């Protein structure tokens, strides 16, 4: 099978946004216009093609990023629909890693919302070029230029409209194309009656003003165009398009377009923009990797001629074919039935079949080429973030880093039969989702599951019931507290046991000090003159690491600490690794009285959107939850309160907000950072953990 679409004509894009901005509907319409779907499914009727898990259809939100392939004007567009709900940030991180470009969907009424900021930040981290699609222009309160303003204010992004809407709300019936200087008028809401016309007289002035601004903004990033512009020469449509494309692919400029996916307006023009302005795999820098043995940095270019290299970015369990591994091919070609090396794990894998996915149906293909996104059946050891490559030309592509879970609950099966199934279910689910963890608490024997938020864990429990038929009881949520030291001190740990025959002896002096936030644990060996023999030094580090898991105040993990081994002594016969391990953990316990240990708690960035009249109640409520209000602003006819609130105080907030605002308020929260717990709260936590 030869290559159907050239690399230049391939686009790998993600569709990202805040919850409810209309991403899934936009993706649906793209699939519809590119001939992949015969009937359109509406998200709010629960029949969308991309949302194929039952819970997604029930809740009307997208949880797993379905990858699907579409064709438009001789190009192949691979689309990954990502969830906008904050608990599923990992899905977004994962898909951005393998994309070349993205479409950020905004709601024309609200503009940039909190989750948009999070996703935008992630896209900036991975250097992903973006187009902004201001959706829902048919909604009451839709305001295109306000939305563009929020991109400048909240994202500090160099974004400029390349289109303007004609009318808004019920009157939204056309789009002005500032690049081609024409307009498209819609005769109905089905997207079937579109007419290309001249820009209507009453909109000409505004269109000229914004076209001028657009040319100026693009010229600033392109010297040749700047010269022409300053000399007053005409800039052709082709030159302007090339300028926008160059500036967009180098992530210096973000074109903004508008439409209403629900009313089938602007979707075809969105597809044109994806092809005109977003990069092909050839336009983005070659992916970097390292050689497994030497850690030497190498590049893999987007080309079929290079050795095969791909990144697995998602694992899914499929009821019919078992485990599906979604991967992005960066270089080379892969045939089904062939063997590859998983260089991250050092394992050989056989690729049984290769499937090209369309939201929930699939077609089997025999070969994938550089730039493709597909799913493999038959991989046994591969997990998210692993590199698959040619056995003769090994490389490890840069992997992805995932955030630590911030919330955990105890879970127990309802019956003995559920007990065994639960183990299988949890291991499969944690294979699919790196931010979900399951472990057994050594002291209580309970199974603990941990994740990124209440909704995340709700959905995990729900999936256990549906997909694995496991019924389980869930305990109250627990916060993932941490502990750390605030002061430095030098402490001694000495372990000596003499009981006939061979004894045990280990003796260390360790200097503990606070580390920078987020730096974790750092161990340094400062021993001179061999007072502690070299072979015991790793044991001291290991002893400390083991003890860090259960902190000194209330048993929470100790983080962000430096430890330096500065002195000690040993015994020729009685010293052993074990003895030094124990001595190190004794030193850590002794540090409690000297290093001023404190408890840290996860702080959430909360944004509450409410009608004006509830402002007082909500501010009072935030303060009563130990929250700090960080800012307020009017958004349309609603008020937005931004605050930093401890996660422990946010449980059940959705219910409280509903009753405080008669169901008219909404909120979103994202994990922001860890912060020291006030003394009174800290005492409560310690008491509770000691079972007093």
From Swiss-Prot:
What GO terms describe the biological role, i.e. biological process, of this protein? ribosome disassembly
Supply the alphabetized keyword list.
Cytoplasm, Elongation factor, GTP-binding, Nucleotide-binding, Protein biosynthesis
Name the SUPFAM superfamilies on file: EF-G C-terminal domain-like (SSF54980), P-loop containing nucleoside triphosphate hydrolases (SSF52540), Ribosomal protein S5 domain 2-like (SSF54211), Translation proteins (SSF50447)
**Which Pfam family, giving just one, matches this sequence?**
GTP_EFTU
Pinpoint the tr-type G domain residues: 8-282
Output a single Gene Ontology CC term carried by this record.
Answer: cytoplasm
Residues recorded as binding GTP, renumbered to this chain, are 17-24, 81-85, 135-138
Question: Where is this protein chiefly located?
Answer: cytoplasm
Tell me where in or outside the cell this protein is found.
Answer: Cytoplasm
* Disulfide-bonded cysteines: none
The GO molecular function terms of this record are: GTP binding; GTPase activity; translation elongation factor activity
Cross-referenced PROSITE patterns? G_TR_1, G_TR_2
| Physiological role | Catalyzes the GTP-dependent ribosomal translocation step during translation elongation. During this step, the ribosome changes from the pre-translocational (PRE) to the post-translocational (POST) state as the newly formed A-site-bound peptidyl-tRNA and P-site-bound deacylated tRNA move to the P and E sites, respectively. Catalyzes the coordinated movement of the two tRNA molecules, the mRNA and conformational changes in the ribosome.
Q: Which family does it belong to?
A: Belongs to the TRAFAC class translation factor GTPase superfamily. Classic translation factor GTPase family. EF-G/EF-2 subfamily.
Q: What is this protein called?
A: Elongation factor G
Taxonomic lineage of the native organism: Bacteria, Bacillati, Bacillota, Bacilli, Bacillales
């Amino acid at each position: 099978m030869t290559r159907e679409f050239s690399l230049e004509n391939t686009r790998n894009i993600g569709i990202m946004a805040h919850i409810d901005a209309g991403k899934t509907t936009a993706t649906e319409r793209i699939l519809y216009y590119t001939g992949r779907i015969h009937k359109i499914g509406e998200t709010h009727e629960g029949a969308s093609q991309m949302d194929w898990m039952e819970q997604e259809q029930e809740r009307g939100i997208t949880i797993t990023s379905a990858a699907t392939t579409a064709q438009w004007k001789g190009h192949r567009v691979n689309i990954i629909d990502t969830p906008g709900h904050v608990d599923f940030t990992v899905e977004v991180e994962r898909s951005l890693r393998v994309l070349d470009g993205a479409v950020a969907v905004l709601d024309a009424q609200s503009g940039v919302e909190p989750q948009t900021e999070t996703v935008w930040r992630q896209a900036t981290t991975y250097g992903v070029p973006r187009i902004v699609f201001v959706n829902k222009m048919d909604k009451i309160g839709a305001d295109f230029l306000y939305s563009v303003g929020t991109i400048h204010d909240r994202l500090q992004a160099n974004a400029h409209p390349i289109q303007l809407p004609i009318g808004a709300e019920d009157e939204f019936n056309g789009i002005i194309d500032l690049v081609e200087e024409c307009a498209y008028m819609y005769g109905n809401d089905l997207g079937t009656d579109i007419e290309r016309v001249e820009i209507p007289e009453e909109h000409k002035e505004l269109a000229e003003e914004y076209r001028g601004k657009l040319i100026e903004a693009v010229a600033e990033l392109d010297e040749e165009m700047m010269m022409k512009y300053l000399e007053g020469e005409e800039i052709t449509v082709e030159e302007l398009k090339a300028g926008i494309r160059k500036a967009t692919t180098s992530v210096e400029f973000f074109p903004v377009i508008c439409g209403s996916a629900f009313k089938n307006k602007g979707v075809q023009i969105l597809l044109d923009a994806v092809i005109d302005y977003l990069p092909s795999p050839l336009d983005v820098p070659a992916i970097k990797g390292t050689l497994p043995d030497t850690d030497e940095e190498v590049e893999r270019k987007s080309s079929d001629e290079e050795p095969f290299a791909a990144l697995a970015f998602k694992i899914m369990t499929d009821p019919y074919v078992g485990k599906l591994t979604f991967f992005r091919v960066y270089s080379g070609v892969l045939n089904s039935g062939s063997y590859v090396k998983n260089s991250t794990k050092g394992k050989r894998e056989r690729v049984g079949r290769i499937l090209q996915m369309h939201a929930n149906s699939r077609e089997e293909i025999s070969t994938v080429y550089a730039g493709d996104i597909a799913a493999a059946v038959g991989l046994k050891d591969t997990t998210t973030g692993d590199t698959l490559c040619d056995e003769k030309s090994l490389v490890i592509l840069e992997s992805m880093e995932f955030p630590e879970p911030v919330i955990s609950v105890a879970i127990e099966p309802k019956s003995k039969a559920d007990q065994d199934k639960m183990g299988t279910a949890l291991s499969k689910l944690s294979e699919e989702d790196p931010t979900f963890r399951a472990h057994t608490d050594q002291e209580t024997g309970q199974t603990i599951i941990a994740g990124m938020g209440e909704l995340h864990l709700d959905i995990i429990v729900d999936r256990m019931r549906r997909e694995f038929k496991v019924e389980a009881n869930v305990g109250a949520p627990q916060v993932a507290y941490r502990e750390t030291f605030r002061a430095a001190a030098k402490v001694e740990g000495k372990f000596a046991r003499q009981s006939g025959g061979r004894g045990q002896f280990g003796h260390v002096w360790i200097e503990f000090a606070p580390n920078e936030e987020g730096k974790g644990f750092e161990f340094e060996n400062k021993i001179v003159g061999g007072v502690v023999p070299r072979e015991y030094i790793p044991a001291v580090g290991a002893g400390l690491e083991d003890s860090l898991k259960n902190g000194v105040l209330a048993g929470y993990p100790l983080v962000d600490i430096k430890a330096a081994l500065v002195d000690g002594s040993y015994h020729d016969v009685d010293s052993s690794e074990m003895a030094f391990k124990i001595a190190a953990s004794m030193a850590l316990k002794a540090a409690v009285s000297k290093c001023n240990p404190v408890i840290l708690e996860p702080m959430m960035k909360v944004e509450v959107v409410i009608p004006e009249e509830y402002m007082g109640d909500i501010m009072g409520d935030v303060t009563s939850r130990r929250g700090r209000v960080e800012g307020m602003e009017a958004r349309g006819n609603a008020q937005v309160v931004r605050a930093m609130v401890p996660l422990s105080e946010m449980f059940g907030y959705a219910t409280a907000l509903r009753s405080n605002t008669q169901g008219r308020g909404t909120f979103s929260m994202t994990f922001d950072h860890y912060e020291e717990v006030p003394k009174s709260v800290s005492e409560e936590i310690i008491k509770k953990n000691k079972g007093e």
